Amino acid sequence: MLTRKQKELLVEELSAIFEKSSLILFSDYKGLNVEQITKLRRKLREKLANGARYRVIKNSVAYLALKKAGYSVDEIEEVFSGPLAILYVEEGDPIEAIKIIYDFSKETKGLPSFKGLYLDGRFFDAEEVENLSKLPSKEQLLAMVVSGVQGPIRGFVNVLSGTLKSLLYALNAIKDKKSE
């Protein structure tokens, strides 16, 4: 059991983390054993290095830390009932973290169950987790944008090179006629 001073320090630490986090996902870990939680943490570490963490946090501590970090917690009080584990992402792609925990949940028959999440400061309820898990990752989105921009440029280059080739053929034909 934590002393009051330890709880205050933990609230300070977590509020600083939550201020920097692009994703804060709330889940009920009941039904997961230590081995499964360790496996989830390992998967997060493999994909996102140390940018994402999955921690079991006392409801009152999480509530106070989020409130101190500037989140509107009064509207989401149902999140703070029952066992609570929080996945937060300080560095890296938050959508990738959502995909990892969602896929893990499918493997473990719906565990952990989702309570909701904050993504870039906006709250989404538990039903939105599946929709967010289907979004492309940041890398995939960047690749789509690059290929979308690259296509017209490539076409323009082909048109220019085709025009230059036609001009070159015409000039060569004129040169051949004059040399005859």
Swiss-Prot record:
Pfam annotation, one family: Ribosomal_L10
GO CC annotations on file: large ribosomal subunit
Molecular functions per Gene Ontology: large ribosomal subunit rRNA binding; structural constituent of ribosome
Keyword hit for Calcium: no
UniProt GO BP: translation
Superkingdom per UniProt: Bacteria
Keywords on record: Ribonucleoprotein, Ribosomal protein, RNA-binding, rRNA-binding
Similarity-based family: Belongs to the universal ribosomal protein uL10 family.
Role: Forms part of the ribosomal stalk, playing a central role in the interaction of the ribosome with GTP-bound translation factors.
PANTHER family cross-referenced by the UniProt entry: 39S RIBOSOMAL PROTEIN L10, MITOCHONDRIAL (PTHR11560)
Complexes and interactors: Part of the ribosomal stalk of the 50S ribosomal subunit. The N-terminus interacts with L11 and the large rRNA to form the base of the stalk. The C-terminus forms an elongated spine to which L12 dimers bind in a sequential fashion forming a multimeric L10(L12)X complex.
Protein known as: Large ribosomal subunit protein uL10
